[in-house]
Amino acid sequence: STHGINWDVGYPYVNKAAFQTLRDDWGANAVRLAMYTSEYNGYCSGGNQAQLRNQIYKGVKYATELGMYVIIDWHILNDGNPMTQLAQAKKFFATMSNKYKNQKNVIYEICNEPNGCSWTSIKSYATQVIKVIRKYDKKAIIVVGTPTWSQLGSDGTHNEVANSPIKGYKNIMYSLHFYANEWSHNKYLPAKLDYARKKGIAVMVTEFGMSAAGGGGGINSSYTGKWLGKLNKYNISYFCWSLSNKNESCSLLSSKTKKTSKWKTTELSVAGRYIRSKYRARKEARSEEHTSELQSPLNLVCRLL
């Protein structure tokens, strides 16, 4: 995942050479374009909307030319309840789904991390936005954010999403976010993921990090490894936060790195070196596993990185 494309820690990496480095050197087959809706230069808080849409268009173009999947991420965070931005979201996703209705590699993430609001409220928002997208794009995968910063339900043990999924539409997935240096994520979320799978709802990890949820402090490679092992076993896609040189431990690039592509391992952060090695190992394992298997589009979707 990029950092916010609204800012200089995010948009410089929306370039074809960066995506190609991720594909060819890291073994990634998907990128996530994180566009903040609030905060400074947010899409709904005074940012230049045409300029921000243009960053999305560029990102989708580069990913498509490289044969990669791409997530368009409506990055709800400080705004909390996605209903706050409903009118803007409907307009934005109408534009995007109309533009990309004939592409099979574009995924719509309609609310990054809802917080401080109920699943009922998120579900109402999601149903309205899904309806808009489906007017133009009948089949694209749509990922719906979940309560408590996308933890599949409110607080540690609640499972509202799996118990009451959105009905009436196909190709709907639900987001799970974890940060490997948060004890509560490691304690509660694996069981919530297992429960969601048991109930038959499709989950995508559209964001995870090796640090605490705030992005700083130490990183936890032990729990990151456990998480990625579980996700690989279940064929669940995952996107690491973040492709940035911002001076925080979850960034994949060293804060001293000025290059925006073709990074040497010495130009990566500790987290970046670890994640690159994991992605490369996963790609190698997959290619060995499936050398004789003809991959269907469904298989490809299941194995997004």
Label every model-predicted segment.
Residues 1-6, 286:
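N-terminal module-boundary/linker segments of secreted carbohydrate-active enzymes
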Residues 4, 8-13, 86, 90-98, ...:
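Extracellular glycoside hydrolase catalytic/binding regions
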Residues 15-79, 86-91, 95, 127-136, ...:
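Aromatic-lined substrate-binding rim segments of carbohydrate-active enzymes
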Residues 32, 134, 207, 294-296:
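Short, cationic motifs built from Arg/Lys/His that form the positively charged side of catalytic pockets
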Residues 40-42, 81, 117-120, 215, ...:
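Short, function-defining helix-loop hinge/capping sites that tune catalysis or transport
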Residues 69, 203, 289:
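Hydrophobic "anchor" residues on beta-strands that sit immediately upstream
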Residues 280-292:
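Low-complexity, Pro/Thr/Ser/Gly/Ala-rich linker/spacer regions in secreted
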Residues 293-305:
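Positively charged, low-complexity/disordered segments
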